[in-house]
Every structure is written in structure tokens, then in C-alpha cells.
Amino acid sequence: MIKKYEACFLFKSEELEYKVALEDVKKQLTAFNASDFVENSLGERALEYSIRKQSRGRYEIIEFKMDSSNLKELEVQLRLIKNLLRYMILVKINKKVNVKKVKRRNFREFKDNRDTREKELPESTADVKVD
């Protein structure tokens, strides 16, 4: 069954390594009969923690259509690409979701209630005398 996927790839930040790895990813996608490519580059960013001694990486998002039976083999081949640090492939769902509007809490009421409680506390402690 052909499904629409969205994949996020994290490559090494060096320009040459990035381009070579991106071409390898595209070759693997075409080898597994992926079609309708939409690419979006998020550019180079600092990583929260180092991955394979890399502190920066380039992000690339690719949307494509592919037969779901080929997904496992594609993931095996993606693991073999040397300069690909991480990847994540998600199934893109185009269903409309009914969102129920939620009533917002009125924080002013909460603050007013808290202020009245704070005023009551000192009065109750004033009755007790400490020697």
C-alpha cells in the first residue's frame, strides 16, 4: 500500500560530506521506488548533545510517497550511510481533526482567591501569642 511519508535527516555539517550523504539518501529513496519528492532544508544548527563527536549538524526534511512494504529495507540501507547521523521517518496523515474549543482558565480569579487566603492567614496567627 502506497503511503505518504515525511522524513527528517540529520547530516554532518561539513559541506562536502553533507552533499554526498544527501545524494546517497536520494539514491536509496529512488531505489525503493519512492516518488513525489518535496525537499525542505532547515540548514545547519547546533546540536543539544554531540552525536558521533559532532556538535553541529544539517537538517533536511523530505516528503515522499512509497510502498509501505519497502520501508524496513529502506531503513536498513539508511543505517549504512556513513555521514547520516540520525533519521526519523513518519507516516503523514491527512485526516482533518475536530478540535474542541477549551475554555481558558481565568487566572485573575485564581490570583484573587489566593490573595484572600493570604490575608486570612496572618489574622488567624495573630490570636496565638508566642512567649
From Swiss-Prot:
Sorted alphabetically, the Gene Ontology cellular component annotations on this record are: ribonucleoprotein complex; ribosome
- One GO molecular-function annotation for this sequence? rRNA binding
Highest rank taxon of the organism: Bacteria
InterPro entries in the cross-refs: Ribosomal_bS6 (IPR000529), Ribosomal_bS6_sf (IPR035980), Ribosomal_S6_plastid/chlpt (IPR020814), Transl_elong_EF1B/ribsomal_bS6 (IPR014717)
One Gene Ontology term from the biological process aspect of the record = translation
What Pfam families has UniProt attached to this entry?
Answer: Ribosomal_S6 (PF01250)
Q: Keywords assigned by UniProt?
A: Ribonucleoprotein, Ribosomal protein, RNA-binding, rRNA-binding
**Function text:** Binds together with bS18 to 16S ribosomal RNA.
| Family designation | Belongs to the bacterial ribosomal protein bS6 family.
- What protein am I looking at? Small ribosomal subunit protein bS6
Native source species: Borrelia hermsii (strain HS1 / DAH)
